[in-house]
Regions:
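Active-site-proximal, substrate-binding regions of enzyme catalytic domains
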Residues: 1-89, 95-142
Length: 143
């Protein structure tokens, strides 16, 4: 089965190109990676450059598609269209994109770590540290 890979997978798990076969990368995904290499975040720009190097090492193993260039749809919509037309599987860790794929009856899956980012970090304070924070002007999270 053909596998259409989203930008976030190439950023976070470029080794997918070593581990999976029949990979399709849209030119729009390459454009996103190219733009991200200049991102002010060192981590993001590093990941974009690392993805580019990994892709360059696998050029003969990857199918690149540029057939949706004239469409004014989002990159996500183009990924869905490609997965649908190619009867492929969309590989993304974008939750909303996986939901859209499910709605359209397109097979999709995540890749890599099953731990998703919650946006929350739990910090345990010692009793004396906790006393310091009680005088600050913010409300403690009760959840």
């Amino acid at each position: 089965m053909l596998k259409i890979v989203d930008t976030n997978i190439l950023l976070d798990f470029p080794q997918i190109l070593d581990e999976e076969k029949d990979i399709i990368i849209l030119v729009e995904v390459l454009r996103e990676l190219d733009g991200l290499k200049l991102n002010p975040s060192f981590e993001t720009s590093f990941k974009a450059r690392r993805a580019a190097v990994t892709i360059s090492h696998h050029l003969s193993d990857i199918t690149f598609k540029d057939c949706y260039e004239n469409l004014t749809k989002s990159v996500d919509d183009k990924l869905l269209l490609c997965a649908d037309e190619c009867f492929g599987e969309l590989i993304t860790n974008d939750v909303y994109l996986k939901v859209k794929a499910h709605i359209k009856g397109i097979k999709s899956r995540g890749y890599g770590s099953s731990e998703s980012y919650s946006g929350v970090r739990t910090v345990f304070l010692q009793t004396d540290e906790n006393r310091y924070h009680k005088d600050l002007d913010f409300m403690m999270n009760n959840h």
